[in-house]
Amino acid sequence: MLYELIKPYSSVSLIGMCKNAGKTTVLNRLIKDWRRMDESIALTSIGRDGERSDLVTNTKKPEIFVYDGTIIATAEKLLFAGGNLSDSGNDAQKNGMNSGISREILDTTGMPTPMGEVIILRACSDGFIQLAGPSMTAQLARLKKRMFELGAAKVIIDGALSRKSLAMPAVSDSAILCSGASYSPDIRKTVEDTCFSAELMMLPQTERTEYVHQCKQKYGVFFGSGTHGGEQTEFSELSRAAELVRKGGAEAVLMRGGVPDSAANALIAAGRALNGLEIICEDGSRLLLSHKNYEKLVRAGARFTVMNKTRLLAVTVNPFSAKGSHYNKTEFYDAMCSGLGGRVPVLDVVSEFGCEAAE
């Protein structure tokens, strides 16, 4: 099922609600599925992944297994990480490491990481690897383009922690949100927070796309065709845009960049003027406000839309916790399905992928 969901898209980001959410298990399943379909894939990460044990929790975790022909973008120092990448058996022995996969270097990127420059290579054998890619979304977008130029048919970006900016359409065509019991001992909190994150990723695209792209400032207030004559007013400061909304009559407000709680509070002060107001942001990853303030705005009659819609393909659930507070897998799956209301498929990494534990 996972392969069929992703098949129409050229790139996908795996986004974790927390560490040990099941991302590596999902990634390995995708790699295996695409191998069966004989498609060329490329892998990178916005953080480090593939190590044998979690560097924070010190718990055992699954490694990333790749096949001959896979394109990989990873940090230079990981080229000789134990049991991972090497030019040859002799090189591995010289560095005191066991040979993992042999590889062919395709390109250097000039993108720095704490573990050295990001190098693009092709696996020449099957084996385990570690990933560590660039930390900036703009760099990921450029890296993705280069991997396509080098022959990749699909690109998978493995996210670190809660880097929901990976869901930006500029970074990938689609996203999978991974949640698990490691997020919180409280199953209700995990479900509620995951459903809220999913809701932000599924916000509809505004019908005012043409007009909002014409807006040059960070904020814009749009009026209808009534007494205001279809006007739009642009501002560089939120306070001035919020003040105009409070005066009433506005149909929409555009907010570029991040939208934190301070921005939400400025709009909440508009009171009745929020009824029917469309709040437009660039994409769901820019909404940094709390669930509480989001609900306040929605209850006041506002609705959220985005300039660039994210394609959330699935939410995966992992009932196992690295901290020991496991969930009942049926209860967790059912609660997530109920919370999402059928708007997106929910996949249990234990039942779907036939594993007893997942990272």
Q: Which residues does each predicted region cover?
A:
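Conserved catalytic-core segment of NTP-binding enzymes
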Residues: 88-93, 136, 140-154, 159-340
